[in-house]
Structures are given as C-alpha cells and as structure tokens.
Amino acid sequence: MSRILIIDLTDKSIKEEAVPTGRYGRGLAMELIRRHSKEGCERLSPDNTFVVVPGLLTGCHVPCATRATVAARSDNGFAVTSITGDMPQKLASLGISGLVIKGRYECGRCAVYMDGDAVRIFPVPGMDGLTCGDIVENIRKKYGSDCAVIGTGPAGDMRLPLSGLFTTYPEGTPRFTCPRSSFGDVPGSKNLRAVIVKCNKYFGAECADEERLIRDGKALARLIIDDPICGGALPGLGSITILHLLKNKNAIPELPKGKKPCRPEKAGRLNYCCAPGCVIGCLNRHSAGNGHVFSAPEEAEVRAAMAHCFGELSEEELDRTASALSKRGMSLGLNATEFVYTAAMYIELAKLSKTSETLLSLIEETARGSVPGRLIGGGTAALGRLYPDREDIQRRVTRPANTKDSERRMSLHKLCPELGDIGDLELLYRQIFIMENLGLCIFSSFALINRPEAMELMARLYSCRTGETVTPVQLLEYAGECLAAEADMAKDSAAASVRHSIPEFVKVLYRYFGEE
C-alpha cells in the first residue's frame, strides 16, 4: 500500500499518512509542501520541508521512468528539481509515494534510513569535511553497495546557494552525480547528511495490471528508441547533441558510419544508464568532439560554460580545466556550471587574471569557505545584488529558463480537440509536467512530446499502474492544475520572477518545438 512518510528531525518522530486522492508526482510534492510547511517561512528555516516524491510510474517496468521530484519552499516561492539515480525506483519499490522531512536535527548531522518497513533517524558523526564521494563510500561500506543514497556535501553544509544534492547511481562508475538544478542548502540547513534506502528491488511498485503495463511499456520504449535523438544522437554522441539543438532545431548530429561511440578508458564496471530501465543511456558516452569523453552530462555542461566564459584558453586547457572543475565540484556538492559563470564575473570585477589557475584557486576558496569563496558560492545573483547599478552585471545574472516565455512562439499539434483553447506554450508546459508527474526522464521528451500516440500510451500506463481509467485530456488537465497551483505559490512571494518553475532543459525544447 502506498504511503507518505512524515519525518520530523526536531522531535525525531516518524509518522505515516495516506496519499491524497488524485495526487501524484510533482503535483503531490507541491501538495505536501503546502500541507507540511509554514507558509511564508524562510528557505533555511526549520519550518520549511524537504520533500522527495517518486513519479507515478517510477518503480514500474516502464522505460525511462526513473525520476523523483525534490521540492521545498524558497524565498522565491518554491524550489523544485527532478533527480534520477537508484533512489527514486527503490523508494517507490518500498511503497513510499512521498517523503517529507521537516524540522532541524540539533545534535550534529543525521541520516534517515529506510529498509522495508523499518525507518530510523540516527546521528552520523565523523563525516563533516568529507567529500561527497567519501560520504557515499562510507555509507555503502556500512550499509551495502546496493543501498541508494541522496545527500549533501561540504557546499550544503555551508548552505551555499550553489550547493546541490548528490545522488548515487547503481554500483559502477560514476558512483554518483550532483544534478545541476538540485539544491543542497535546504537539507544542509536541517543538518540532514543523507537519506539511505536499502532495497533489493528497482521495479517493486504495485501495479493493478502489470502484464499489460509491461506490454505498453515496450511500446513506449520503441517510440523512444526509434527517435533519431533519443535512440541515435544522445546515446551515440551525448550532450553535444543538446548544444547543436540549442543553435538549430534541425542540427541533429549523426554518428559517422562505421564509427563506434567514444568510450572512456577506465577499469571496472561502467554505468551507461543512470538507473535500470533507461533505454537512452547518457553516462560515459558524451564526447567533446575531440576524443575526450565525459562520464556524465554535467561534465559536458561545465565544458560548455568554460568555452563561453573563457574562450581565449586553448582547447586542451579548456578540456583539462573543465574536467578538474567538474570533479572538484562533484566532490564538494557544488554546481560547477554555475560556479564557472559566477567565477568569470568575480574575476572581471576583482580584476584578476583570466586564467585556469585563477579559476581553480577560486573553487578552493569556495571549498575553504572564505569570504570570496562564499560570495562566489552564492551564484551570479549574489554578485548581482552587490552591483544593482551595473546593467552589464545585471544582464549576466542567471535567470530562470522561462523568464521570457511570453516571447516564445511554439508550433505544436492540437493533441486534444477538447482543449483547443490552450495555447502552444501552455500545452508544452503541461506535457513537461505530465512527464514529471509520471517520473519520465526529460531527455525522452524529444520522442514523447507532441505525439498523440505517446499521450495515449502514457494514459494507458497510468491505468495499468492505478487501475483507474484516464484519458490524455485528464492527464493534461491534472498537469494544468499543477501549473496553476505552483503559480499561486509563486504569486504569494514578492520575490518570484516567474509564475512557473520549468526545467532548464526547456531551452532546448523551445528551439526544437518552436516555429521556424
């Protein structure tokens, strides 16, 4: 039976409650925030909640259904991201539809541990100052290499705005990642070191009709694999594909005939997928175009940021520095891509030498928690607040991807005549929310968005999972309710700059589904 776990770190209580009727996925995450956190609370207040909600299809035999929504209140209304790795499927396989963590642990740092029906809160001394990799190794050494972990590292301990979560992968290399869009300051403020799930199943979520779900899941997999981006360019050439599409929607790179995708020369088992059930594969396949291979998409993003901000460096130096920054950022639990943009601003303002040595020294300042390091760890927004009179600085402050969404011109099919009054941009956002509600990887959006047959399959998969018949229209209507609810939360915050929190990946979708 699916349930919601409510964990209060202040009084160390653990409670359960029923899943609200008709709520699932990202929509459920926002509902839990409203129910269990104090409206108007500050981002780092004990009154805030840290919520993890697997997608409705996560934990089932559905391709690319590997995601969970992570959310909390924020000074800008709310913070929300989508994570993958081995945690979402194992959490769902334990029958946990939502995890709510509130309060603040006052006796050092703690971990929340789940194993079957057992749930515990306990202190984890001796991990302060350790890198994320060392934290993962310590936990897996004690609780087994098959346990799934999300948590915070040194950057989260300092509650830096650029801190992120680390999320483990199944056993292999890489061991973990720090998603760029995640946030580690909220769990860091609760003194929550890690959430640990011990479960030997990835596909243990209850399904009303598992046989039919597996059959329809195979049909969905075929749509994804047959797509030229999801089944060709992404697994073959990696995130360089995304960089091409940002420039031109038709610039889908092709792997030269007879040439195999680049592979890193590493010993031991390699993870090519972030979680079991992924049919795309985005790990250890990302070529820089010059033979250099990135182990994960995040590394390619750091390299792209380096090329944008430090283009005067040689290609070899860009590769070397980007790799070093990415690894160091991962070890700290720091958003290395945003670090590059912020450090570039700081170097210019402080009139420092624009060299790779300067850049590498600044990330060590952040690791030490020095004044310059903490300032850079605050992101471009922190520097922007120091220079409100400088338009050139304000233009470089990172904004949400959909800040100027009203200027976008999309070209989508009218999937459902009953919803003919919905604009194309709203329709795009609703389809993104359907994927997040169901737990589907955003990379599969190239194959699934704007396709009636994909919408029908997703509706059938919902029915197989729950036993309740729904139509594509109902999925879109629920997504619309989720969008409206989030807009209301943002409206309550005077600091909110956008009505909706849409994944950064939407920049690519704007281009791909935009008008010519």
Features from the language model and the residues they span:
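Extended C-terminal regions of large enzymes
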Residues: 7-8, 14, 24, 140-516
